[in-house]
C-alpha cells in the first residue's frame, strides 16, 4: 500500500509532525541514541520511516534517551514527514517494517510546536526486581534477580520518599553527562511487592545520566540491610558520588511513559508493562536480612 520507491509530491507539500507511542525490548540495542558501531532503536526506527517517506532526511526525537539494554513500554517519539500517509496509518505501516523487538502502539498528528522531549512534563520509569529463590527464565530479560535475602521494601520506600521534590542528585549521575546541572524534580515514587516481584517506580521532570540504575543499586543495598538510611541520605545530600558504586543491571529498567500537558494518545496507546509469568509462588521464603551495619 505504501511503496518503498520515492513518491513525487508537489513542491508545496507541507511538512507534518507525527507523534508515536513506541515500545521496545532493549536487550539487543545499544540504547535509543544512534551509535557509530552498534545498532540503536533510533537508527532502526529512522530507517523504517525513511522507507515510507524518502523525500527528506528523517530524525526521530525521543522523550527519553534510554541506555543499552533498557526497555520502553511508552516511549514517545516525533518526526517530521511530507509524504501522503495519514497519521493514523503510520503505526501499521511501520510495524510491517520493524523487527519484533520494536512496536509502534499509536501514531497521531501533532503541531510543529510540539516536541517529544522538550514538551514533556515528566518521565516515569519502573525497575523490576525478582526476589525469588529459584531462577525464572521468563523473568530474566525484564528483571534483576536478587535472591540472597528477602528485600525489606519498607525501608526502601522510606528512602525513596526522601527524594521527593526539587533535588540535586549529583550522587546518582554517571560520569560523561553533558547536563549543566544535576537538579531535577522528583514528582512521585512507588514501591510494590507482588509475591517475589518488587516493582519500583519513580517519576520526575527529568532524569540524570545513569540515575535510576545507580539509585536502584543503593536501594537494594538498603533492602538487604547492607546500608542504613543515614548513610544513604548522607551520600546523596552531600553529593558523595564516589561512594555510590553499584549500578543495577539494565534489563530491570523500563521507561513506562512520558507525560504532557494534554493527553496525546488514547488510553490504549500506553501499556503498563507488568510481567505476568509464574512467579514461583510455592518457593520457600527467603531469610530476612540482618541488621544494617552502622557507620
UniProtKB/Swiss-Prot annotation:
It is an enzyme of class 5 (isomerase). It comes from the Bacteria. Pfam families: PseudoU_synth_1. InterPro entries: PsdUridine_synth_cat_dom_sf, PsdUridine_synth_TruA, PsdUridine_synth_TruA_a/b_dom, PsdUridine_synth_TruA_C, TruA/RsuA/RluB/E/F_N. Keywords: Isomerase, tRNA processing. Signal peptide: none annotated. Its EC number is 5.4.99.12. The active site is at residue 67. The keyword tRNA processing applies. Homodimer. Formation of pseudouridine at positions 38, 39 and 40 in the anticodon stem and loop of transfer RNAs. This is tRNA pseudouridine synthase A.
Amino acid at each position: 500500500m505504501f511503496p518503498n520507491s520515492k513518491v513525487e509530491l508537489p513542491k508545496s507539500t507541507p511538512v507534518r509532525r507525527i507523534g508515536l507511542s513506541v515500545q521496545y525490548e532493549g536487550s539487543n540495542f545499544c540504547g535509543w541514541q544512534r551509535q557509530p558501531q552498534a545498532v540503536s532503536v533510533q537508527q532502526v526506527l529512522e530507517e523504517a520511516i525513511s522507507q515510507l517517506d524518502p523525500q527528506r532526511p528523517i530524525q526521530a526525537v525521543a522523550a527519553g534517551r534510554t541506555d543499552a539494554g533498557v526497555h520502553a513500554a511508552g516511549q514517545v517519539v516525533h518526526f517530521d514527514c511530507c509524504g501522503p500517509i495519514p497519521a493514523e496509518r503510520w503505526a501499521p505501516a511501520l510495524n510491517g517494517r520493524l523487527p519484533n523487538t520494536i512496536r509502534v502502539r499509536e501514531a497521531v498528528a501533532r503541531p510543529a510546536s510540539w516536541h517529544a522531549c522538550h514538551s514533556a512534563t515528566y518521565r516515569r520509569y519502573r525497575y523490576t526486581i525478582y526476589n525469588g529463590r529459584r531462577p525464572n527464565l521468563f523473568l530474566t530479560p525484564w528483571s534483576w534477580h536478587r535472591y540472597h535475602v528477602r528485600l525489606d521494601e519498607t525501608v526502601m520506600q522510606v528512602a525513596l520518599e526522601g527524594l521527593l521534590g526539587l533535588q540535586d542528585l549529583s550522587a546518582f549521575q554517571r560520569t560523561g553527562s553533558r547536563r549543566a546541572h544535576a537538579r531535577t524534580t522528583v514528582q512521585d515514587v512507588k514501591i510494590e511487592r507482588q509475591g517475589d516481584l518488587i516493582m519500583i517506580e519513580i517519576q520526575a521532570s527529568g532524569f540524570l545520566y545513569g540515575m535510576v540504575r545507580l539509585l536502584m543499586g543503593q536501594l537494594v543495598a538498603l533492602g538487604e540491610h547492607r546500608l542504613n538510611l543515614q548513610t544513604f541520605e548522607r551520600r546523596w545530600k552531600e553529593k558523595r558520588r564516589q561512594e555510590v558504586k553499584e549500578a543495577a543491571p539494565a534489563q530491570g529498567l523500563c521507561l513506562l511513559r512520558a507525560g504532557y500537558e494534554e493527553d496525546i494518545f488514547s488510553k490504549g496507546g500506553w501499556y503498563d508493562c507488568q510481567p505476568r509469568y509464574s512467579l514461583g509462588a510455592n518457593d520457600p521464603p527467603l531469610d530476612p536480612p540482618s541488621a544494617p551495619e552502622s557507620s
